């Protein structure tokens, strides 16, 4: 059971996620995994089997033990024992004992979901034994509570990007550690780190470390860097095959085969994959591609033989069972092929490759049974039909079955699919079909589908498959004036790390279709994040907004359509605001531009961005009004930005009031800044993020002569737990902790604490290695200079350190230095504003 959060945030999410504002809990279940961040592996075409059993336990409430035979609760708070069962149980003996002494005993007869409750004196510190034995003597439960499980609590899993985590690539001591950490971030889909960054450091430490070499080769395959991948394989092969040409682990030759396949070196790939099959661990995936190449050569006997070889490793193989049946059909065993396909479909109704092959061949032979028609095939595609059919088509094209591959995509044009999919045939489905038809010599059909695709640049799924690079290159080659093909090719090339080539594609798309706003926006992303032209991103985004407002905003449209149009504009304005902010644009100019171009109905994100823009020019009442007049339902993890915008604006207002001698009004601001308004429907992920609001409240109380109240408030910051739970708790939080320590009378230790922090911050400022910007779900397309951002954050902290020791001049100098590195620091800007006043 998973609850979203505690305190205000927990209450907010309970309200957001329930109809009656009751308690919300999320059921979390898995197999082959012990916890959410714990993973296992599934190999290509491997099938894992698992079972899950669910039954109601509401009667017993929180169980101390549960299995397939029942659940038992030991409710120490209410001094109750409860038992329930998932199936009818008659005359079973139920006992709860402590040290051999039975404290509860009964013969129970229960129906499913019924429960019995017993009074019992339960000791909070004791470990009880639970037993349930059927009337025929079978032991259904036998469990003794293990208190050690509660004692052995794991340590916090500190965020990678924190220096103290010890998980950064150059912090790890060995190539092995870097390889394992890289493997973990890949499994965890970490948004800021990629496995390749760790593998490269592993190879700095040990250039012959084979696991990292193979991992880099795999990464190169996944990003279509085939030639580079072969270089890593050559290095690994030189080490691994120094004395033995046949290593135990066949992945080195399997990935070599894939890389050769990616380069369209079919013969070399075939030979290399055979070499890979000498090792047991890659027989199934290697034989799959071997069987496909056999199909390309129309060697159906070999295709059948090699598909069967793969099936000996994985009897429920997702591809080779169908390849085997297709080979039988091609060899003339029609009845055997159809029988195999029917068996596959009966065992797995979601095997769409087999379902299509069955519909295709049954229709060709005139032996279609119930549920086997083409209409049945398309009618059961409940997820995106085009994506499923592209997958099927590419599996068929691998084996040279162009007629079937074309047929599965052609059927999308007229298919009646599940009602949620209004346009079953997507842009990429048209381009893929055009590519298949073109290779088959049907230029007329290919041209027709490319023409249709070119008219639909807005897609629901971006191209991501390696094969789609070739599909789009084919489209661009066939029609160099196809802006949609250039645009989509740029998208997939950017995803595969070909940044400069992607930008050229988007540039061409913008030239060919200047009224299509997305290429302009994508060029801004590339220039800002990858091409070293951050300043150029602003003009590109302004162009995107100009184009969008001209071509995508129709004031005569219906309300629902207008909202959709506004959502697109909202994103562009939000992104431009971010870029201008990061690049140090004049605050008033930025705010005026955003206010001129913002849509009538704002998203949550743009609302708090505008509030921050008002705070940036010190108009805190307007910032607070923006936040007050909007109804928020913040997305997960974005609450932090909303609450920070609110707390910061109120604290700044309070500090200005305090300068005017209005202490009561200032105190009210500081206190309100720590309580979320109802319209926010949010809270703090970590209430320690209120560290500065807490200090200003305490300091104001002290200024008012209310010393005891002030110290009680200051105690909320001491001790301070560095949990890394909130991205807004920058290093300067320790400055406020030290201030609170000093207020509480511990002057010596506060100075030691501050001195220790300053020394750490100075080291961080000097460190340019392994830096990443703070991850945000809002602007991750725009990747700022992580080294500058880190230096800026720690320089701000050093400025506060100067303030602690009374050096205002030194603090001002450091604040200015920090803003030159990263102009997007409202705290530094406001401190300078106060100093100047």
Model-predicted regions and their roles:
Residues 1-47, 55:
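A contiguous, surface-exposed recognition patch within enzymatic or periplasmic domains that forms
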Residues 183-184, 209, 218, 243, 249, 258, 283, 292, ...:
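Residue-level recognition of tetratricopeptide repeat
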Residues 195, 229, 269, 303, ...:
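Single-residue signature of alpha-solenoid repeat helices
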Residues 199, 233, 273, 307, ...:
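Hydrophobic/aromatic packing residues within the alpha-helices of TPR/SEL1-like helical repeat arrays
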């Amino acid at each position: 059971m998973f609850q979203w959060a505690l305190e205000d945030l927990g209450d907010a999410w309970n309200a957001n996620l329930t109809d009656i504002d009751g308690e919300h809990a999320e059921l979390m279940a898995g197999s082959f995994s012990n916890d959410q961040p714990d993973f296992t592996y599934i190999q290509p075409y491997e099938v894992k089997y698992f079972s899950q059993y669910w039954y109601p336990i509401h009667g017993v409430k929180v169980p101390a033990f549960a299995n397939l035979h029942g659940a038992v609760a030991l409710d120490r708070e209410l001094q109750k024992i409860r038992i329930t069962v998932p199936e009818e149980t008659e005359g079973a003996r139920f006992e709860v004992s402590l040290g051999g002494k039975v404290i509860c005993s009964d013969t129970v007869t229960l129906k499913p979901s019924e429960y019995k409750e017993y009074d019992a004196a339960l000791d909070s510190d004791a470990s009880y034994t639970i037993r349930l034995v059927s009337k025929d003597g079978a032991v259904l439960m036998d469990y003794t509570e293990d208190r050690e499980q509660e004692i052995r609590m794991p340590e916090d899993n500190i965020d990678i990007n924190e220096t103290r985590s010890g998980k950064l690539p150059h912090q790890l001591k060995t190539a092995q550690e870097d390889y394992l950490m890289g493997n973990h971030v890949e499994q965890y889909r970490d948004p800021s780190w990629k496995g390749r960054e760790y593998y490269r450091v592993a190879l700095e430490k040990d250039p012959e470390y084979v696991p990292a070499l193979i991992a880099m080769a795999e990464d190169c395959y996944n990003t279509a860097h085939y030639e580079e991948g072969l270089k890593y394989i050559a290095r690994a092969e030189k080490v691994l095959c120094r004395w033995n040409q046949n290593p135990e682990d066949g992945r080195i030759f399997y990935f070599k085969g894939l890389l050769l396949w990616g380069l369209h070196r079919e013969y070399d790939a075939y030979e290399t994959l055979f070499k890979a099959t000498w090792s047991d661990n890659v027989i199934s995936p290697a034989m799959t591609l071997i069987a496909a190449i056999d199909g390309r050569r129309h060697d159906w006997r070999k295709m059948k033989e090699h598909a069967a070889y793969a099936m000996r490793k994985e009897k429920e193989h997702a591809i080779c069972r169908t390849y085997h049946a297709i080979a039988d059909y091609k060899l003339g065993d029609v009845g055997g092929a159809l029988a195999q396909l029917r068996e596959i479909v009966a065992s797995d109704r979601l095997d769409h490759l087999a379902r299509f092959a069955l519909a295709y061949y049954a229709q060709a032979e005139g032996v279609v049974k119930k549920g086997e028609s083409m209409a049945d095939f398309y009618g059961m595609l409940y997820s995106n039909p085009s994506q499923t059919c592209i997958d099927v088509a590419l599996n068929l094209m691998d084996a040279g079955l162009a007629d079937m591959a074309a047929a599965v995509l052609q059927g999308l044009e007229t298919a009646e699919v599940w009602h949620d999919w209004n346009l079953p045939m997507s842009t990429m489905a048209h381009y893929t079909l055009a590519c298949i038809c073109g290779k088959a010599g049907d230029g007329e059909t290919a041209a027709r589908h490319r023409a249709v695709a070119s008219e639909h640049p807005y897609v629901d799924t971006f191209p991501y498959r390696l094969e789609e690079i070739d599909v789009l290159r084919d489209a661009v080659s066939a029609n160099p004036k196809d802006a949609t093909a250039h645009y989509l090719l740029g998208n997939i090339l950017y995803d595969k790390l070909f940044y400069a080539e992607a930008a050229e594609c988007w540039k061409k798309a913008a030239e060919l279709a200047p009224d299509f706003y997305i290429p302009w926006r994508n060029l801004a992303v590339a220039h800002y994040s990858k091409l070293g032209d951050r300043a150029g991103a602003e003009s590109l985004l302004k162009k995107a907004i100009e184009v969008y407002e001209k071509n995508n905003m129709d004031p005569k449209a219906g309300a629902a359509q207008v909202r959709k149009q506004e959502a697109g504009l909202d994103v562009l304005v939000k992104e431009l605001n971010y870029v201008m902010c990061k690049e140090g644009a004049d605050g008033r100019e930025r705010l005026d531009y955003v206010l001129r171009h913002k849509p009538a109905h704002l998203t949550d994100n743009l609302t708090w961005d505008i509030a921050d823009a008002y705070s940036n020019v010190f108009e805190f009442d307007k910032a607070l009004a923006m936040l007050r007049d909007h109804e928020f339902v913040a997305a997960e993890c974005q609450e932090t930005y909303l609450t920070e915008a609110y707390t910061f604006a109120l604290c700044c207002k309070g500090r200005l009031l305090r300068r005017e001698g209005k202490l009561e009004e200032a105190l009210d601001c500081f206190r309100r800044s720590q309580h979320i308004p109802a319209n926010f429907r949010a809270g703090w992920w970590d209430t320690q993020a209120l560290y500065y609001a807490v200090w200003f409240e305490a300091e104001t109380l002290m200024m008012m002569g209310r010393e005891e109240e002030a110290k009680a408030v200051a105690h909320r910051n001491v001790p301070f737990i560095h949990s890394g739970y909130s991205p807004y708790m920058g290093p300067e939080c320790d400055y406020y902790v030290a201030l609170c320590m000093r207020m509480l009378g511990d002057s010596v230790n506060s100075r030691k604490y501050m001195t220790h922090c300053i020394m750490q911050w100075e080291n961080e400022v000097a460190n340019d290695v392994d830096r990443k910007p703070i991850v945000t779900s809002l602007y991750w397309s725009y990747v700022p200079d992580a080294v500058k951002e880190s230096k800026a954050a720690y320089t701000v902290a050093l400025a506060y350190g100067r303030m602690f020791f009374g050096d205002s001049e030194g603090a001002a100098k450091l604040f200015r230095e920090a803003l030159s590195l990263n102009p997007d620091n409202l705290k530094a800007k406001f401190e300078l504003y106060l100093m100047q006043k």
